[in-house]
A protein has these predicted regions:
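Juxtamembrane cytosolic amphipathic helices that cap and anchor the N-termini
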Residues: 1-12, 91
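A membrane-interface helix-boundary motif in multi-pass transporters
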Residues: 149-167
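Structural signature of the two symmetry-related core transmembrane helices
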Residues: 70-85, 164
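Helix-to-loop junctions at the C-terminal end of transmembrane segments
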Residues: 55-67, 151-152
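Short amphipathic helix-loop junctions that connect adjacent transmembrane helices
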Residues: 24-41
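Intracellular juxtamembrane helix-capping segments at the cytosolic ends
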Residues: 108-121
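A late C-terminal transmembrane helix in Major Facilitator Superfamily
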Residues: 123-153
């Protein structure tokens, strides 16, 4: 189980890093690259946040039926589709509609990620919860470390491709974790 816990730490850290790259850069991408209004960035965050809670509840409902690993895989695929679609979207309406994928991604990560750690470490629930919480911090560190360098050298587009790559790493690691 220690190996599974370590792999899940990588999975969740990569998922949070991808999300944090998006959160750091999305407003600038919307304004500087797509030349859309700054109001849109706030609307996108608001819609995603409003949809995350129902997604967490839906994920909790399906958790016993399809398992945590499959739900996390659904989250990763949703995230990959979301970041790829954000790169291609050019209108405010499409950017807003895509937030459903973002909400699926984050709703499952927030709702199921911690439970997965706790199930892998049933004798250490507090440690499992802390470990999960630390994946968010590690994600911020990773995203913040590469963000400025990548934008300066390449572009905002490169960050979305990096986010997709991080989710690819998460997906590969997830496939080696026992489903509980």
């Amino acid at each position: 189980r220690k190996r599974d816990t370590r792999l899940l730490f990588v999975v969740c850290s990569m998922m949070w890093a991808a999300n944090n790259l998006y959160m750091i850069n999305m407003p600038l991408f919307i304004i500087d690259e797509l030349h859309l209004t700054d109001k849109l960035a706030g609307e996108m965050i608001g819609i995603a946040a409003g949809l995350e809670i129902p997604m967490m509840l839906i994920a909790g409902y399906y958790m016993k039926r399809i398992g945590k690993r499959l739900l996390m895989l659904i989250a990763i695929v949703s995230g990959m589709c979301f970041y790829a679609s954000v790169l291609m979207a050019t209108t405010p309406a499409i950017e807003l509609e895509l937030q459903i994928l973002n909400a699926i991604f984050l709703g499952i990560l927030c709702g199921i990620g911690m439970l997965y750690f706790q199930d892998l470490m049933p004798e250490k629930i507090g440690s499992a919860t802390t470990l999960y919480a630390n994946t968010s911090r590690v994600g911020w560190i990773i995203a913040g470390s590469v963000d400025g360098i990548m934008v300066e050298i390449w572009s905002y587009h490169a960050l979305f491709w990096l986010a997709i790559g991080m989710l690819g790493i998460a997906m590969i690691c997830l496939l080696f974790i026992k489903d509980i």
